Amino acid sequence: MSEVDEGIQNLSIEKADAGATATATATATTAEKHNQALNSTLKTGLDKSVESQTANSAGSSPTSATSSSNNPHYDVKSTIKSTKLNDEQAQKLTKLISSVPDILKQTKNPAYDEIFGYRINSDGLEYVDIPKRNEILLKFLAADNYDLDLATKRLIATFNWRNEFQPLHAAFDEKFHQELNELGVITQFASGNDNLHVITWNLYGNLKSPKKIFQKFGEGADDGQREGLAKSSSNSNSSSSSSSSGNNRGKNLPGSQFLRWRIGLMEKALQLVDFTDSKNHKIAQIHDYNNVSMFRIDPGMKAATKEIIEIFGQNYPELLSTKYFINVPLIMGWVFTFFKTIGVISAETLKKFQVLNHGDLKETLPKQELPESYGGVKSAKGDPKRSLFDLDVSESIKLTKYGQVVLQRLGDEEIAHNNDEVE
């Protein structure tokens, strides 16, 4: 399964005059028809694809449980709380778990055994949380329709990517420029619907000049420019979660500042989910297009969007519950054609897209907790209106214990490397 992020292509935005009372009913009816049309168009042609994928997925109907003494996979099956497995699925998960030591041996760095802040290794080793490990491995297995060979290849690729990219470092040990921090927040609603408790928001209306943003923070920026921006960010942005400044390992960590910021946002959000809870083992994403004024997609944004989609698809499987596109201008339906034509999003993921040409989310998210601009309770007279940034929890998120061990190890390696260079 692919996890989707950003995307904007050629458009022209026409603002309608915020209507007279006499036309309000007609406008609301038109908007509702537009929402239905967009969602219908998005899902047209996908049902057969999803049905085909489902038909080919492994697993028959659950059979009666037998004793764990005769079926070792039954012990694994009992640890899974996010969903119900049949015996065949549990057997495959058991095989995948037992093969983890061999999988690690096939990676570029067998000592790197972390995914989403958890240690993925054999039972009995320090920091191995067996239920959470099993749930994470299940996501990789389910993403490939319970194909053990494909799941193994995906895991090897993910271990290698995490070892090289160091996403925990991006999330907890790097600072980013305020212009990037204003593009996204993380919210957590305790009373939210199932798997809508943790949400990452992408605020495209705050993207005032896409071309300049990606010249400064995208792949178009050279290393010297990125480092300079990171240093200036550390002086101007005191709200970051770490004392480090920017990509403080310089050229040793890959990716643009924009990419590292976006991956860091995802990693932080995952610290808030409970992989063993069927109601909170996935996150939602909301893309807000309010006040978007671009008339065409910037090439830098297009490249960054495709890169993020590919990274999420490979390395963050089965983690998206729903993706909302809100405040989408009536003329902006092209954006979903863009998502389909780039060819890196599965039909199953596209089915999770919901399109709204307004920002009223009170039917989906807790009204009492939402800002007024998203359909929440109006502020009392004289009280300042709450903004989405008032709900941002990203700076209070704590990393898992093993995640901290991984970062400490990375820091020790960097110190040793620097000492070797001095000597």
UniProtKB/Swiss-Prot annotation:
Upper lineage: Eukaryota, Fungi, Dikarya, Ascomycota, Saccharomycotina
Catalyzed reactions: a 1,2-diacyl-sn-glycero-3-phospho-(1D-myo-inositol)(in) = a 1,2-diacyl-sn-glycero-3-phospho-(1D-myo-inositol)(out)
Protein name: Phosphatidylinositol transfer protein SFH5
Signal peptide: none
MF terms (GO), sorted A to Z: metal ion binding; phosphatidylinositol transfer activity
Membrane-traversing stretches: none
Name of the gene encoding the protein in the UniProt record: SFH5
Pfam families cross-referenced by the UniProt entry: CRAL_TRIO (PF00650)
Family annotation (InterPro entries): CRAL-TRIO_dom, CRAL-TRIO_dom_sf, CRAL/TRIO_N_dom_sf, Sfh5
Origin species: Lodderomyces elongisporus (strain ATCC 11503 / CBS 2605 / JCM 1781 / NBRC 1676 / NRRL YB-4239) (Yeast)
Comp. bias intervals (Low complexity): 20-30, 54-72, 232-248
Binding annotation for heme: 204, 262, 287, 289, 323
UniProt membrane topology term: Peripheral membrane protein
Cofactor: heme b
Region of interest: Disordered: 1-76, 221-253
